[in-house]
Amino acid sequence: MKIVIASSHGYKIRETKTFLKRLGDFDIFSLSDFPDYKLPQEQEDSITANALTKGIHAANHLGCWVIADDTMLRVPALNGLPGPLSANFAGVGAYDKDHRKKLLDLMSSLESLVDRSAYFECCVVLVSPNQEIFKTYGICEGYISHQEKGSSGFGYDPIFVKYDYKQTFAELSEDVKNQVSHRAKALQKLAPHLQSLFEKHLLTRD
């Protein structure tokens, strides 16, 4: 069964591929395999809308099942920022380090700040060319560190520490992060749908 990961981001592709391979013998592709196809710009005000926009668009144009996702980081002390703006927090086209710097600067300006709690929320969608849609969510709670640590991962990973851990996401190995992250939790909830689809595919093929 062919399935496309609607991303060109190496880390996301590896994480999702590893997950899919545990469920069945899927024919797995990513947007890197379709250089002429471009996802629409993320312009919605929710991760659900962004994930659906990407998933539906890719499924329609590529003619196969697609997995798409969108993630945001929320910091309660900053009234939920960066929120849906997470990917463009420091401006469209800014680097990950710019987004992290803006967040740390905002937090340092709150002199009486005690609560550094934060959480990632991820929406993952599985979409068919016929507009069949499965949707799941995953949340990972933790806090924002005072400075960047680690060189792995991407985005806000160098400043996010999961509760019960002493290392930032950027200091964890990919294997560990892929077991506890927000995306991992959302993908795990998608597993029954994927397994059912794979079994139906085998029956149809036989």
From Swiss-Prot:
Substrate binds at S7, S8, H9, G10, Y11, K12, T71, F154, G155, Y156, D157, K177, H182, R183. GO terms for cellular component: cytosol. GO terms for biological process: nucleotide metabolic process; purine nucleoside triphosphate catabolic process. It catalyses: XTP + H2O = XMP + diphosphate + H(+); dITP + H2O = dIMP + diphosphate + H(+); ITP + H2O = IMP + diphosphate + H(+). Its EC number is 3.6.1.66. SUPFAM superfamilies: ITPase-like (SSF52972). The keyword Nucleotide-binding applies. InterPro entries: dITP/XTP_pyrophosphatase, ITPase-like_fam, RdgB/HAM1. GO terms for molecular function: dITP diphosphatase activity; ITP diphosphatase activity; metal ion binding; nucleotide binding; ribonucleoside triphosphate phosphatase activity; XTP diphosphatase activity. It comes from the Bacteria. The active site is at D70. Mg(2+) binds at D70. Its cofactor is Mg(2+). Keywords: Hydrolase, Magnesium, Metal-binding, Nucleotide metabolism, Nucleotide-binding. Homodimer. Belongs to the HAM1 NTPase family. This is dITP/XTP pyrophosphatase. It comes from Chlamydia pneumoniae (Chlamydophila pneumoniae).
